[in-house]
Amino acid sequence: MPELPEVEVSRMGISPHMIGQTIKAFVFRTPKLRWDIPQKLKKLEGQVIRNISRRAKYLLIETDEGTAIVHLGMSGSLRVLDADFPPAKHDHVDLKLTNGKILRYNDPRRFGAWLWSAPNEPHAVLGHMGPEPLTEEFNADYVAEKAKGKRVAIKQFIMDNKIVVGVGNIYANESLFKSRIHPTRPAGKLTKKEWQLLVENIKATLEIAIQQGGTTLKDFAQADGKPGYFAQELLVYGKAGEPCPECGEALQEQKIGQRNTFFCGVCQK
């Protein structure tokens, strides 16, 4: 599943080809992904793309007349191609530009989304979100205050978009291991020093993943079609039964909040 680094890598990859260009047309090869594809997106035809930004795991393609909002879902990816490049299986949406290029959206599992919002009217999916993890607003003081009295497992806590956006399963596992914090620890029981370390490791892990082009486990590809290389940096995710890179004990796996969780029962307390 594409997480924040993968979405940011996609944004960085498509932006140079699209900002300042004019939208010629949309092509929809399916009426529905996770939700119905709104025909209001066609209001953006003829509009200049002013900016491409990201909020949590959503990409925002901004024009003066509204915004196209893209979510990659479980298996989505975006590529910039020549307009005559033939569509393949699972190529569901094309955004055609007047410069002869297209932004092509591929999504085998169709859990992604294309949405529309009017100018200066944020879409409902972007409401009630916490701060971005790579901003100064996300810091030890902030999360320690939010965690006071909370008994929820720390892994679920840092994956809650109302607390902080975009810390997905892969990066939550990796950050907790680097911080030597057991994923089932109650969030309200962490010390200020542990919060400081965890926040630092979340930021560092996400930044390295972005530099490496994200994590490709199955479907994700960058805008140029290349895979992300952060999978080579993974310490615990997907490695149950393998030796812990620190102590050599077998890494463990269990479900926490319906998500596969990987950790070392010796190193993480």
Curated annotation (Swiss-Prot):
> Which cofactors are named for this entry?
Zn(2+)
List the keywords (alphabetical).
Answer: DNA damage, DNA repair, DNA-binding, Glycosidase, Hydrolase, Lyase, Metal-binding, Multifunctional enzyme, Zinc, Zinc-finger
Query: In Gene Ontology terms, what is one molecular function of this protein?
Result: damaged DNA binding
Coiled-coil ranges (or none): none
Instruction: Report the active site residues.
Output: 2 (schiff-base intermediate with dna), 3 (proton donor), 57 (proton donor), 259 (proton donor)
Enumerate the Pfam families for this protein: Fapy_DNA_glyco, H2TH, zf-FPG_IleRS
The record places its FPG-type zinc fingers at 235-269
Q: Where does DNA bind?
A: 90, 109, 150
Domain of life, source organism? Bacteria
Copy out the cofactor comment.
Binds 1 zinc ion per subunit.
The record's catalysed reaction(s) read: Hydrolysis of DNA containing ring-opened 7-methylguanine residues, releasing 2,6-diamino-4-hydroxy-5-(N-methyl)formamidopyrimidine; 2'-deoxyribonucleotide-(2'-deoxyribose 5'-phosphate)-2'-deoxyribonucleotide-DNA = a 3'-end 2'-deoxyribonucleotide-(2,3-dehydro-2,3-deoxyribose 5'-phosphate)-DNA + a 5'-end 5'-phospho-2'-deoxyribonucleoside-DNA + H(+)
Gene Ontology biological process terms from the UniProt entry = base-excision repair
Q: Does the keyword Acetylation apply?
A: no
Q: Does the keyword Transmembrane apply?
A: no
EC number(s) for this protein? Answer: 3.2.2.23, 4.2.99.18
Q: Note the SUPFAM superfamilies from the entry.
A: Glucocorticoid receptor-like (DNA-binding domain), N-terminal domain of MutM-like DNA repair proteins, S13-like H2TH domain
Say which family it is in. Answer: Belongs to the FPG family.
In terms of NCBIfam families, this protein maps to: fpg, PRK01103.1
Subunit details for this protein? Monomer.
Question: What role does it play?
Answer: Involved in base excision repair of DNA damaged by oxidation or by mutagenic agents. Acts as a DNA glycosylase that recognizes and removes damaged bases. Has a preference for oxidized purines, such as 7,8-dihydro-8-oxoguanine (8-oxoG). Has AP (apurinic/apyrimidinic) lyase activity and introduces nicks in the DNA strand. Cleaves the DNA backbone by beta-delta elimination to generate a single-strand break at the site of the removed base with both 3'- and 5'-phosphates.
Protein name in UniProt = Formamidopyrimidine-DNA glycosylase
